[in-house]
Regions:
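Metal-dependent nuclease catalytic cores that hydrolyze phosphodiester bonds in DNA/RNA
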Residues: 1-73
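Hydrophobic, Leu/Ile/Phe/Ala-enriched alpha-helical segments that form helix-helix packing faces
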Residues: 22-26, 103, 107, 164
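A generic fold-level signal
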Residues: 58-60, 91, 170
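Conserved active-site beta-strand-loop modules that form the wall/rim of enzyme catalytic pockets
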Residues: 64-66, 72-79, 115-118
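Short beta-strand-loop-alpha-helix junction that forms the active-site gateway
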Residues: 79-88
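Short alpha-helix boundary/capping segments
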Residues: 87-94, 145
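An active-site-proximal "capping" alpha-helix that borders the catalytic cofactor pocket
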Residues: 93-106
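Metal-dependent nuclease catalytic regions and adjoining charged, substrate-binding loops involved
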Residues: 106-188
Length: 188
């Protein structure tokens, strides 16, 4: 998605770089003692199970920040540069739960317990600088904790996999895509 919005990738990279090695309580006092120890790494889960049966489906994603906490757990932070009202825990919960699932159930290696997850939002508020060489943006920073809800995440992803693996429904007369595919397949 950052390719569609060129500055999003640049701003996200600046935000991630800024917090490399940061003490978690300096990001937000509500966070457990620890330090940001990883950033921008890919995670891949073991195969997901639906109704106790292993599927061919896995989760693959790239998180922004992970902390190693003093109590042996980890924290997960997704960085956002935005002024959107949708920057809420509810909107981003599935994304963070997917990363958390992958960290706790990795395809290889030992899983780690994700004790906290949240959004670190930078909202640009003003321009700063006094010369051509040092202009920038000031931001309002807000940490938004996201409650873990792995049970709901696994339920929704299970329903999604069931649809993907299920029988294809009969095409409807009003479905333009269905009609196109039927006509296209008839050419073969």
């Amino acid at each position: 998605m950052p390719g569609a919005f060129p500055l999003v990738g640049t701003m996200a990279a600046l935000q991630e770089e800024h917090f490399q090695g940061a003490d978690m309580p300096t990001i937000d006092p509500s966070l457990r003692p620890g330090k940001v120890s990883k950033w921008g790494e890919w995670v891949k889960s073991k195969p997901l199970a639906v109704n106790g049966v292993e599927t061919r489906w896995r989760i693959l994603g790239k998180y922004d920040l992970v902390s190693t906490n003093e109590d042996g757990t980890i924290g997960l932070i997704d960085c956002k540069v935005s002024d959107s009202q949708r920057d809420t825990g509810q909107f981003y919960s599935p994304q963070l739960e997917a990363y958390a699932y992958s960290l706790e159930n990795p395809a290889a290696g030992k899983g780690q317990t994700v004790a906290s997850m949240g959004l670190l939002v930078w909202k640009p508020t003003h321009a700063i600088g006094t010369s051509v060489d040092d202009y920038g943006f000031g931001v309002f920073q807000k940490y938004i904790p996201i409650e873990r809800d792995q049970e709901n995440f696994l339920k929704v992803i299970g329903e999604f996999i069931t649809v993907l693996e299920g029988e294809l429904p009969e095409p409807g007369a009003e479905c333009a895509t269905c009609n196109y595919l039927l006509a296209r397949n008839a050419l073969n």
